[in-house]
Structure formats: C-alpha cells, structure tokens
From Swiss-Prot:
Belongs to the universal ribosomal protein uL29 family. GO terms for molecular function: structural constituent of ribosome. This is Large ribosomal subunit protein uL29. Pfam families: Ribosomal_L29. CDD domains: Ribosomal_L29_HIP (cd00427). Signal peptide: none annotated. InterPro entries: Ribosomal_protein_uL29, Ribosomal_uL29, Ribosomal_uL29_sf. GO terms for cellular component: cytosolic large ribosomal subunit.
C-alpha cells in the first residue's frame, strides 16, 4: 500500500466507484490495525495513521460529491 501515499483527489475521482469502495475498505482495515498498534504502544510509522485518515476522508468526500451531483440531476 505504499503507492497510496500519492492518492490525490484527482486520482481518486478517476477511479471507478467500486475501486474506491474496495480501497476504502482496505484503508479502514489498515486504520484499525494501526490504531490497535498505537494502543499497545508500538507503531512503526505513526504518521501513517494521519495519512490513512486523510485518504479515507478524501474518498468519502468524493463519494458525497458524486451523490449530490446525481441528486441534483434528478430534480
């Protein structure tokens, strides 16, 4: 998952919704693992927690934007 460092909004928008959801699930699982490590007092890359949270937020934001566009086009 090292390539996720460069996941900018532009790249995420170009992904298919299914790909984004799959990535979102993977990132959430990684975040749980990292949070567990942090609770135990050992995290290899503490900055990765922040990075993963931000990528998750980007994905959720993009999904919400697309949802609002669809709703707007229907009305």
């Amino acid at each position: 998952m090292s390539s996720e460092k460069k996941l900018k909004a532009k790249v995420l928008r170009e992904m298919k919704p299914e790909e984004r959801r799959e990535l979102l699930n993977q990132l959430r699982a990684e975040l749980v693992r990292l949070e567990t490590q942090r609770a135990r007092g050992f995290v290899e890359k503490p900055g990765r927690i922040r990075q993963v949270r931000r990528i998750i937020a980007r994905i959720l934001t993009i999904e919400r934007e697309e949802e609002l566009k669809k709703a707007k086009s229907r009305s």
